[in-house]
């Protein structure tokens, strides 16, 4: 007696077993076998990034230099993350340090005043090259991180006795970080970064700028930290998984599309120029046999002579009877020729829609909105514009916290150590820890950059006032959203109030009345919109 055969249940494709088909499709061949030829290797970040690291960054550099959309993406990062002034808001951890809150506030005011004098000096003493203020260095760092995936800053010491502070910083291009003598990567030296067995960076190999190529390339090893804990070389990037040594630039996911879009735009422009260049064409009759003789016999001297003679006859005829469109005379054409007027044609042919689709894809990869990347705000309502701005704002705030603020805080700590040693600022006497014992606690701070873009100024102010009145926010947070320091605003308001009183001016009561009127009008509009909905 034969054992009955149990039929195998198959999936929708009729080939894959149902048991296999019920699993994750991404690891299989896919419906109809679409994924069968897609077999990428499983690699670590360094294995995927470092072999073509130099070429990838060079391509990103070329995009930023020669592609308008790429340059705009970098500009958006600089303007929305940093802005025109990257303001320090020093807030030491006074509870941990064992000092009073008022002592901490007094110390912070002293530190902020000294820091601003040092960092934003027009003489650019903070920069080794004497080209940048502190805000300019942060803007450069954000741009460097965007199109190179990382930023480097070297903390140096000025030996000149003419300045109060000797601390200086040098912006270092990621192109200069490489293995000495351009050797291959090893377990403890990858792409110019010396690491220990745990993957922590110990130092960096920095090559000298050899332009214009008249001197041999040399490398200098710079430690990450000095023995006392002071930062010597600042390296900021966002790793995506463990074991990553260098940063990946933001253009990797959209680099191919951006290059092809650039080529497409140039081709479209050339096509439009060609179509607009020729207003009239003269078509000459040539029988098939003669045409094939000219084409196939192009290497024959006899055929070349025949072709030259034929073209010469045409040129001689039209030299005697030139074709002109601006004159009143209607010319006689050579027998067999026809005069065709070329009308202007639509050069778009669906190009704009295709370009928008590509730009939306590119904007998603770069973390900005399509409207910001393309500078096209047409056909947008307030709600759409606000949602788009909020999405980009969340991305920019993450970059401000983990890129710009990290660079700024490490630079600030280097300066604060010297300021304390030189007694430019004085630590509170009752502090539990010294600066060397609690660097992070003494240097704890926030950084205020550019404010959030206001779509409707009145509604945004009303929202801020309501949040403060409801206890859901503070003046500090709302002013920071606008790129301002609430303490500076309060101090300025006190000065202005005293000056108005001294001048015999009344408080601007009309401002409060106008605000209440606008608030009532906005509420009525929202109620009418809800009724209509």
Identify the role of each PLM range.
Residues 1-102, 531-533:
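N-terminal-proximal low-complexity accessory segments that begin disordered
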Residues 124, 147, 151, 242, ...:
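Intrinsically disordered or highly flexible coil/loop and linker segments, enriched in small
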Residues 2-4, 337-348, 390, 458-533:
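Activation/maturation switch segments at domain boundaries
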Residues 122, 128, 328-455, 516:
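Surface-exposed loop-to-helix/strand elements on domain peripheries
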Residues 109-120, 132, 139-147, 151-154, ...:
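A broad, structural surface signal
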Residues 39, 132-138, 155-172, 287-300, ...:
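Charge-rich, acidic-biased intrinsically disordered regions
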Residues 76-239, 467:
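Structured, mid-chain assembly/scaffold modules that mediate subunit interfaces
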Residues 233-388, 431:
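Extended, charged amphipathic alpha-helical segments
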């Amino acid at each position: 007696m034969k054992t009955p055969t149990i039929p195998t249940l198959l999936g929708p494709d009729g080939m894959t077993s149902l048991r296999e088909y019920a699993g994750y499709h991404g690891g299989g061949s896919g419906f109809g076998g679409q994924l069968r030829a897609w077999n990428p290797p499983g690699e670590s970040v360094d294995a995927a990034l470092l072999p073509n690291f130099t070429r990838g960054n060079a391509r990103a550099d070329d995009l930023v230099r020669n592609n308008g959309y790429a340059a705009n993406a970098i500009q958006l990062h600089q303007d929305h993350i940093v802005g025109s002034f990257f303001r320090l808001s020093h807030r030491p951890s006074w509870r941990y340090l064992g000092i009073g809150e008022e002592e901490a506030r007094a110390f912070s005011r002293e530190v902020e005043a000294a820091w601003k004098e040092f960092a934003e000096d027009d003489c650019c003493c903070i920069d080794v090259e004497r080209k940048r203020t502190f805000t300019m260095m942060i803007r450069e760092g954000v741009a460097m991180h965007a199109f190179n995936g990382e930023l480097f800053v070297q903390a140096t010491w000025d030996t000149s006795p003419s300045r109060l502070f000797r601390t200086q910083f040098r912006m270092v291009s990621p192109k200069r970080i490489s293995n000495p003598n351009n050797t291959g990567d090893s377990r403890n030296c990858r792409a110019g970064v010396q690491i220990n067995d745990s993957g922590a960076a110990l130092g960096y190999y920095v090559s000298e700028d050899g332009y214009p190529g008249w001197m041999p390339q040399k490398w200098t090893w710079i430690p990450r930290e000095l023995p006392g804990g002071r930062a010597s070389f600042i390296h900021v990037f966002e790793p995506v998984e463990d074991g990553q040594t260098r940063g990946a630039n933001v253009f990797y996911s959209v680099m191919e599309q951006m290059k092809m879009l650039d080529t497409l735009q140039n081709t479209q422009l050339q096509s439009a120029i060609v179509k607009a260049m020729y207003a009239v064409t003269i078509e000459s009759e040539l029988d098939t046999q003669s045409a094939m003789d000219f084409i196939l016999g192009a290497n024959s001297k006899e055929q070349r002579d025949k072709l030259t003679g034929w073209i010469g006859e045409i040129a001689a005829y039209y030299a005697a009877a030139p074709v002109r469109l601006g004159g009143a005379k209607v010319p006689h054409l050579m027998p067999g020729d026809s005069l065709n007027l070329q009308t202007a044609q639509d050069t778009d042919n669906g190009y704009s829609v295709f370009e928008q689709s590509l730009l939306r894809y590119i904007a998603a990869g770069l973390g900005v909105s399509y409207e910001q990347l393309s500078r096209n705000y047409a056909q947008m309502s307030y709600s759409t514009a606000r949602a788009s701005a909020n999405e980009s704002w969340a991305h920019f705030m993450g970059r401000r916290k983990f890129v710009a603020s990290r660079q700024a805080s490490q630079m600030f700590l280097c300066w604060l150590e010297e300021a304390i040693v030189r007694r430019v600022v004085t630590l509170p006497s009752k502090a539990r820890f010294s600066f060397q014992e609690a660097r992070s606690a003494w240097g704890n701070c926030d950084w205020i950059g550019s404010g959030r873009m206001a779509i409707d100024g009145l509604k945004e102010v009303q929202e801020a006032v309501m949040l403060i009145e409801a206890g859901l926010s503070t003046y500090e947070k709302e002013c920071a959203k606008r790129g301002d320091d609430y303490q500076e605003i309060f101090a300025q308001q006190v000065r202005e109030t005293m000056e108005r009183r001294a001048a015999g001016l009344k408080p601007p009561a009309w401002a409060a009345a106008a605000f209440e009127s606008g608030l009532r009008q906005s509420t009525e509009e929202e109620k009418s919109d809800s009724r209509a909905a």
